[in-house]
Amino acid sequence: MRPSRTLTTAAAAALVLVLAACGSGGGSGDDSGGNSGDSGGDSGPTAGKVGVILPDTASSTRWETADRPLLERAFEEADVDHDVQNAGGDAQRMATIAEQMIADGVTVLAIVSLDSASGALIERRAAQQGVQTVDYDRLTLGGSAEYYVSFDNVRVGTLQGEGLARCLDDRVGNDESVNIAFLDGSPDDHNATLFSSGAHAVLDEMEGYTSVAEQAVPAWDPRQAAAIFEQMYTRADGDIQGVLAANDGLADSVISILGRDGQAGEVPVTGQDATVDGLQHILAGDQCMTVYKPIDQEVDALAELAVALIDGDEPETTDTVRDPEGDRRVPSVLLDPIPIYRDDVKRVIDDGFQSAADVCIRDLEDICAELGIE
C-alpha cells in the first residue's frame, strides 16, 4: 500500500440538535460524495472503515482536485473500505455526514473542520460511539481528536515571511521603510493563525518593514479578499510595497486589484498551495512565491495512521501540537512545506501536482520552455 468559521450560539445549538437527531442512522441521501468500497459484507483484508469529511470547495481548490482523488486512491491501494465526502462549506451538513458515517460503521473518522466549535461537537459525538477521530490539515481547537495530520503551519508562514523579504530585498535599505500589508486567512481557521505567527516572527524582527494594514478574510473568500485589499490599498493611498497573502486564492484577489492600478508585478505578493493560478502568476512575474505542500504526502500520512488505528497499532508520529483551548498536546504527524519561486515551478510540475498543460498556456508557453517545464 502507499505509505502504504466560529458558530454563533444559535447555530451551535442547531448543530447539537442535528447530531442528536441523526444518531439513529438511516439512508444517506447526501450528494456531497459517495461511498468508495463496499458498505457491507467483506471489506477486504483490513477490517474497518475510514470516513473523511473535507470542508468545502471555496477555501482552496485542493480539496476536490487533489485531496479527494488522492485519498480514494490511497485507501483503495491499502484495501481499506472508505467514504470521502465534502461538506460544501456547511457546518450542519458536515455534522449530518458525520452522523451518517458513524451509522454506517466507520471506525476512524478524519475531518477538516469548518470551525472548531462544530468540529469539536462532531468529535465528541464520534467518541461517544467508539469512533476514533483524526484532525486532518486543520487542528480543531477544544476538540478531542486522538491525532493530527498536517504540514508544519508555522513553517508555512515562516517561508512566506522569508519569501516576501527576499522579493523586497532590493527595496530595503537607504533608511527607507517598506510598507507591507497582511491579508490573513479565515479567523476561524487555526491554520491561518499559525501562518500569520510564522510570517510575523520573520518580518517583525527585520528592520526596514512597516506593517500598514492587516485583516483576516472570512472563509478565505476571494471576493471578500478583493474588497478588503482594495480598502487597504485606498486607505494607504497606494503606498504598499509588499503583500503577505496567506494563500494563492487571496493572492489572486490582491493581484487583480493591483492590476487595476498598473502595479501587478511591481508589488511582490506571497501565496500558498501552488495552485494553477498561483504558478501562472509566478511565471508571469505578478506573484513573488507560493508554498508547495505535497498533498500526496499528507494523504499517505493519514492513510498510514488510519490503517494503524484500524489494526489496533499505535501510529507513528513526529511531534505534538498544542491545542490552546483544550489545554492539551495532540500527537501529530507534521510534514515539511516547500517554498516555490519562479525557478522552482518545474518541481511542482515534475511531481505531477500540477500539469504543464494547465499551467503553461498562452503567453506562458515560452516562459515554461525557457525553464524546461514540459
Name what the model sees in each region.
Residues 2-4, 22-374:
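A residue-level marker of the well-folded mature domains of exported/periplasmic proteins
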Residues 1-20:
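Sec-dependent bacterial lipoprotein signal peptides
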